Amino acid sequence: MSAPILEMDIDPVWGDAIDWEDIASRAAEAAAKVAPELAHENLLVSVVLADDDEVHALNKQWRAKDKPTNVLSFPMLSREEVLHAAADEGAPGMLGDMILAHGVCTREAAEKGVSVETHATHLVVHGLLHLAGYDHELGEAEAEEMENLERKALALMGIADPYAVED
């Protein structure tokens, strides 16, 4: 299965006991199965596993939000350009950058009762969909479409629905 090429940069705070590159690669493969525009090895994604301070600074600079967030995505292409790049057999095109915050990811995983690996997998899928042009902040229909793609990708990896409400 083709998927975007991932270039990883992992801050030591994430540790080396877990194969984060493998987790991100499997997430990319699953995302490519549910969003065919990602099913191409001619798309390049930079994935940075950072600490909260780095994500906080980026979130403040680029989104005017003075706090860290779980994942930031910086697309390099419009939705139309993504679809065109996916059809191009030329050299890899830069889809964009994605940055995950370790502390936020760890806290959210604990709140959700899932492993950090599971939550990080979800965030990589979420970030890839943003880079492909999906945006849950555009409206309810867009949010539902994106969440459904996330659910499908995660289900392919045996990961439960992250949006399911527990009674």
Curated annotation (Swiss-Prot):
This is Endoribonuclease YbeY. One of its GO terms (molecular function) is zinc ion binding. It comes from Novosphingobium aromaticivorans (strain ATCC 700278 / DSM 12444 / CCUG 56034 / CIP 105152 / NBRC 16084 / F199). GO terms for biological process: rRNA processing. SUPFAM superfamilies: Metalloproteases ('zincins'), catalytic domain. It is found in: Cytoplasm. InterPro entries: MetalPrtase_cat_dom_sf_prd, YbeY, YbeY_CS. It is an enzyme of class 3 (hydrolase). Its main location: cytoplasm. HAMAP family: Endoribonucl_YbeY. The keyword Cytoplasm applies. It holds the Pfam family YbeY. The gene is ybeY. Zn(2+) binds at residues 126, 130, 136. GO terms for cellular component: cytoplasm. Binds 1 zinc ion. Belongs to the endoribonuclease YbeY family. Keywords: Cytoplasm, Endonuclease, Hydrolase, Metal-binding, Nuclease, Ribosome biogenesis, rRNA processing, Zinc.
